[in-house]
Amino acid sequence: MRIEEDLKLGFKDVLIRPKRSTLKSRSDVELERQFTFKHSDQSWSGVPIIAANMDTVGTFSMASALASFDILTAVHKHYSVEEWQAFINNSSADVLKHVMVSTGTSDADFEKTKQILDLNPALNFVCIDVANGYSEHFVQFVAKAREAWPTKTICAGNVVTGEMCEELILSGADIVKVGIGPGSVCTTRVKTGVGYPQLSAVIECADAAHGLGGMIVSDGGCTTPGDVAKAFGGGADFVMLGGMLAGHEESGGRIVEENGEKFMLFYGMSSESAMKRHVGGVAEYRAAEGKTVKLPLRGPVENTARDILGGLRSACTYVGASRLKELTKRTTFIRVQEQENRIFNNL
């Protein structure tokens, strides 16, 4: 047993210090990034935000809606090959280039992903997703995927420490997904005692990944556009959002009615709700590590997307970053004990 004395920080523990700026308007800020990925050697340009691969967020409808904002969607792994075929038949190449194909690490997952990728060459992203990216089996699967799909851009996770980030990049991942426990419907930290404050995880993993020519995506912990800005400021190349994009018309959650008001169910992918839906229930050897919440319906996702992008542009103007790429270089975090004036929050 050992104790690390360094204080680790989440998004709620800091604010970004404003700096002098020559920008005249938020419209002067360029949010689009251009990347060439380490292993796939593929080039990509767009807004580096990703809708999470949850079945109540990462839907085909969400992918179609967010593609118009140049935002990626990690489509959840529970669609059949036939459903993928129908989606591809009805989608433009521009939509497909904003889609990530999600997969688990079983042999069946591998075969299914292979079939999906064979449907259309425009599908360039694979998201290999497990709750715990520290297993040897996971690293071996990433290497197997890289060998099978040498020209596909592979995103793999989740991990929260630099050494595991390096391990995954050396095994074939182009992008490492960072985050254990910060999600809005994740209870891993409560059930297991395991986790890492998200901002510190992002800063440390970005440092490790960038040293090897890899990239990271900050997955979880964002509750506001300001948190998205903090994740980019901390060095994240991409930011993945779940709860912020849940409850919309495109989110795909089941709608329930209570006292004449409609709500959409949103749940973590290790929750009892998810396991009942996809594997018939919670296995007796494990505990559910997610919760289910009812969200008021929030309408089309385009309004939320504009709010997030607007907040991000504004953050850039406050620190004098004319491009999103410059935000991390212009960011100085200050430690704080309060984020906002909450006097009217309950009205």
Curated annotation (Swiss-Prot):
This is GMP reductase. The active site is at residue 186. Catalyzes the irreversible NADPH-dependent deamination of GMP to IMP. It functions in the conversion of nucleobase, nucleoside and nucleotide derivatives of G to A nucleotides, and in maintaining the intracellular balance of A and G nucleotides. It comes from Shigella boydii serotype 4 (strain Sb227). Its EC number is 1.7.1.7. NADP(+) binds at residues 108-131, 216-239. CDD domains: IMPDH. The gene is guaC. Gene3D superfamilies: Aldolase class I. The keyword Oxidoreductase applies.
